[in-house]
Amino acid sequence: MRIGEISRKTYETDIEVKIDLDGRGKYNIDTGIGFFNHMLCMIAKHGIMDMDVYAKGDLDVDFHHTVEDVGICIGKSIKKALGNKKSIKRYGTFFIPMDESLSMCSVDLSGRPFLVFQGELKNSKVGEMDTELIEEFFRALAFNAEMTLHIKVFYGKNTHHIIESVFKSFAHALREAVSIDEKIEGTMSTKGMI
C-alpha cells in the first residue's frame, strides 16, 4: 500500500496529514479555512486518493502559515507514499475547464523541486482566503514532494472557478503521474532512479 503519513507541529501550526495514493477519493479535511477545505477535497476526489488533513493554525494572524504548512505536509506525504517510485508513470498533464475558466497542470515526479505558476486570479480573496496563498500552497507542496509542477491559467472571470479548475487539473495530473504501469521496469528514467 502506498500511504504517506506526516505530523508537523510548530509554534504556528499543528498539522496531521495521511494520504493513500491507491484510495477511492475519500477525505476528511479540516484546516479551519472553509474555501481551502473545499479545494483540498477536490485533490482527493479528483485524484482518487484518500486524504485526511487536520490543521490548527494561527488563523488570528492570517491564513498564510496554515496554508503553506498544509502544502508542506501534503508534499511530504506524497513523497513518502511514493517510496522508491518503482513503475510509476512519473508524468501527468491535464486540462480542466470550469465553466468560463480553463487551467492546465503538468507534473513530473522527478525528484527535482520546481514550480511555474502562470495566470491571473481576478480577486484578491475568495471567501476569507487571500488568493495569493494558492501559489504559496502549490510551491510548498511541489518542493516538499520533490516534483516539478507547472500550472497555467489560460483564462477565466470568476476567481472561484479559476482556482477550482487549477486544483482539479492538479489532482488529475497527479493521479496520472503516480499511476503504476507494470510495463515500466524499475523507474521511468535512464538514470535508473528518480
Curated annotation (Swiss-Prot):
Its EC number is 4.2.1.19. Pathway: Amino-acid biosynthesis; L-histidine biosynthesis; L-histidine from 5-phospho-alpha-D-ribose 1-diphosphate: step 6/9. GO terms for molecular function: imidazoleglycerol-phosphate dehydratase activity. Its main location: cytoplasm. SUPFAM superfamilies: Ribosomal protein S5 domain 2-like. One of its GO terms (biological process) is L-histidine biosynthetic process. It comes from the Bacteria. Belongs to the imidazoleglycerol-phosphate dehydratase family. This is Imidazoleglycerol-phosphate dehydratase. It comes from Clostridium kluyveri (strain ATCC 8527 / DSM 555 / NBRC 12016 / NCIMB 10680 / K1). The gene is hisB.
